[in-house]
């Protein structure tokens, strides 16, 4: 689960990380009251969406007068921001964050992530802040320092010193950055976050370190332990199909293509998307119905896929292990009879009782095209949609 910048900063402040003072605004009518709470002539107006790259898209504006601030807010509210992290349709701005400006001396990058490969939390630090850390890692990998924290001992002072050792930082700077690293490490563990990122972490002209931007992503599976964090969820920022899918235990991710996919198993789902791309088309979604799909689950999966207007065809790829293919076939037939499908449908079944499942589909007198293998199925749906 993602949250907004202002929410992330509020959480970080609870762990002792310095953040600029700011106020959330939903309309122009709230501006005067919001500005009265700030003690700076320079105000930064920030669009609040669940995506990075806002600055390059016009979603972060520095204003120095009341008129500039109001103009920036007016231009942002209700607009659609398209960044490298949004879909091509972008995301609508429903709220902005007004924040006190500060005198920036230097920008840094720091984050704490759950490193599943290492089985530890990793702290990542760079003196090159304010830009994508991926770019820095690609062009100047020596400037990205990664420190893995053994969970038995937790974050120690030497971890902070290791982060700053080759960065030509003073003892005071090292001490302050180490302190922040320890705080975000504690925040990750305490909130069950997958990642906490501060970019940029700025050093001001007075030597203070402030989180100028912050992002936090939480582990959905641990949210039941944090009802206060669950309340921060902004459903307006999430894709409605993904929300609906989660209600039915489906793993769904919307994509930009036109061929809908229904598959059981994440690995098989990714392979299905790959082969669709191999034949020259683009998948409209990732959808894993899981190993215990029922008729109701299949029906809901079809509804979610068809809610995307871009879908011109559907490929169902099921491997029957524990789940029998004849049960899946009956579920597909019942789902089609219930909701109707007006786009081409290709189904590939393999595994337990796949012959019976294929016969049920062929004898159903419904507009279902069966395939013997995944390659044939992908080739058929791609070519049918192209016609």
UniProtKB/Swiss-Prot annotation:
GO biological process, one term: succinyl-CoA metabolic process
Known role: Succinyl-CoA synthetase functions in the citric acid cycle (TCA), coupling the hydrolysis of succinyl-CoA to the synthesis of either ATP or GTP and thus represents the only step of substrate-level phosphorylation in the TCA. The beta subunit provides nucleotide specificity of the enzyme and binds the substrate succinate, while the binding sites for coenzyme A and phosphate are found in the alpha subunit.
The species this protein was found in: Ehrlichia chaffeensis (strain ATCC CRL-10679 / Arkansas)
Domain ATP-grasp: 9-244
GO molecular function: ATP binding; magnesium ion binding; succinate-CoA ligase (ADP-forming) activity; succinate-CoA ligase (GDP-forming) activity
Similarity section: Belongs to the succinate/malate CoA ligase beta subunit family.
Record keywords, A-Z: ATP-binding, Ligase, Magnesium, Metal-binding, Nucleotide-binding, Tricarboxylic acid cycle
Catalytic activity: succinate + ATP + CoA = succinyl-CoA + ADP + phosphate; GTP + succinate + CoA = succinyl-CoA + GDP + phosphate
Gene3D superfamilies in the record: ATP-grasp fold, A domain, ATP-grasp fold, B domain, Succinyl-CoA synthetase domains
A Pfam family matched in the record: Ligase_CoA
EC number: 6.2.1.5
InterPro entries hit by this protein: ATP-grasp, ATP-grasp_succ-CoA_synth-type, ATP_grasp_subdomain_1, Succ-CoA_synthase_bsu_CS, SUCC_ACL_C, Succ_CoA_ligase-like_bsu, Succinyl-CoA_synth-like
Pathway(s) of this molecule: Carbohydrate metabolism; tricarboxylic acid cycle; succinate from succinyl-CoA (ligase route): step 1/1
PROSITE patterns in the record: ATP_GRASP, SUCCINYL_COA_LIG_3
Subunit and partners: Heterotetramer of two alpha and two beta subunits.
Residues annotated as binding Mg(2+): 199, 213
Residues that hold ATP according to the record: 46, 53-55, 99, 102, 107
Required cofactor(s): Mg(2+)
Protein name: Succinate--CoA ligase [ADP-forming] subunit beta
Cell division as UniProt keyword: no
Amino acids binding substrate: 264, 321-323
Co-factor remark: Binds 1 Mg(2+) ion per subunit.
